[in-house]
Regions:
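Short, charged/polar "capping" segments at the starts of alpha-helices
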Residues: 39-43, 144-145, 208-213, 276-279, ...
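Active-site metal-binding loops of divalent metal-dependent hydrolases
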Residues: 37, 87-90, 110-112, 139-140, ...
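His/Asp/Glu-rich metal-coordinating catalytic cores
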Residues: 1-9, 18-188, 192
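Hard-cation-handling environments
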Residues: 149-262, 326
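Short internal beta-strands
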Residues: 30-40, 136, 200-209, 269-272, ...
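Short hydrophobic beta-strand that contains or immediately precedes a catalytic carboxylate
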Residues: 12, 109, 254
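C-terminal regulatory/interaction regions
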Residues: 194-199, 225-336
Length: 336
């Protein structure tokens, strides 16, 4: 109770669990900063209290206060200045930090890449960070070089490729129920799916509400059984769940639960949705359920992390005086 947090602040880079899960455990007197979009996404994902660990002092749906910033905003923490800079990642609203102390220039990349819809954000960040004294650099993609590749799995080169593959699957299956799911924090991918496919895309209602909040974009939507109505959604865009269950040609819709109710022999596109992969104990039972219904499972994955060659490009663009690898199991593979 007697701690002095006058010159203390915490920054969130983006809305993934490994960066946000324990937010509610941060002392309420410490300011918590992030980009506005990340604040929107975290609040949306924790709408029902299932995303963040609950505070022991609040109800289960509590999300602690965050201060939403615009890209380029500078926050003073004592004698330290922190600029929050937008980067491209598969969680929309991701940010890096450029930190200036009285004697040094320090850069933290957060998680970033060069193969997303907003790669120019990462390039502009690199320009801002040029010749930083210390570069704290993520290296997730170099951690798993020995992971076995899945035969016949589609391997999109970039986010645009994901949308092209979805459009192709629609064309190849004109009279077949097609559903999909993705990771909700990747709001940009959902936006591009809505824009870039031939069928009418129908999102689960909370995802449609998040798309509208972040991009001011309306989309058709449906409510899960028993879900409360959302005032921010246009009632004329609602499609009934039963209509979607019976459809074979008009809709591409986001399936988030009750996969046993999908049509036998239908097509399901798994685009970085949960369960995320074979490391998740729920993954194999999920695949088994689809197999029992003879539902074709197509995985369309596009990493939010810079590819190994792009990590080298980013380091070369920044030319840091000192490189500090983080967020990787093989830091020795990142070279300045």
């Amino acid at each position: 109770e007697d701690k002095d947090y006058a010159n203390t602040a915490v920054f969130i880079s983006h809305a993934h669990l490994d960066h946000t899960r324990m937010l509610n455990y941060l002392d309420p007197s410490i300011p918590l900063y992030t980009l506005k979009e990340t604040k929107m996404i975290v609040n949306s994902l924790n709408r029902n209290g299932v995303f963040l660990l609950p505070s022991p002092f609040e109800d289960d749906t509590f999300t602690r206060e965050m201060i939403g910033l615009d890209a380029g905003d500078v926050i003073k923490v004592g004698e330290i200045e922190v600029e929050i800079v937008r980067v491209d990642h598969d969680a929309y609203g991701a940010a890096a930090l450029i930190i200036k102390t009285p004697g040094h220039h320090i850069t933290y990349t957060g998680d970033l890449r060069l193969h997303g819809h907003n790669a120019e954000d990462t390039i502009e960040f690199c320009k801002k960070a040029k010749h930083t004294d210390i570069l704290m650099m993520e290296g997730v993609s170099i951690s798993f070089g020995d992971r076995k590749e899945v035969e016949d799995e589609i391997k999109p080169e970039n986010e645009e490729d994901v949308i092209r593959h979805i459009a192709r699957l629609e064309q190849e299956n004109p009279n077949r129920q097609i559903t999909f799911n993705g990771y909700p924090a990747n709001v940009r991918r959902f936006e591009k799916i809505v824009e870039g496919t031939s069928r009418t895309v129908v999102l689960e209602a909370t995802m449609a509400a998040l798309l509208k909040e972040v991009f001011q974009k309306d989309a058709h939507y449906y409510y899960r059984d028993g879900a409360p109505k959302l005032d921010e959604l246009d009632p004329t865009l609602e499609i009934s769940y039963q209509t979607l269950l019976e459809d074979t040609s008009k809709y591409l819709w986001q399936a988030v639960d009750h996969f046993e109710r999908l049509q036998e022999g239908s097509l399901y596109i798994h685009s970085d949705a949960q369960p995320l992969g074979d490391f998740d104990p729920n993954y194999q039972p999920f695949l088994d359920l689809l197999a029992e219904k003879h539902i074709e499972f197509v995985r369309l994955s596009c990493s939010g992390h810079a590819k190994p060659d792009d990590l080298d490009r980013i380091i070369a663009m920044i030319e840091p005086k000192c490189l500090v690898p983080i967020h990787t199991l093989k830091p020795e593979l990142l070279v300045n």
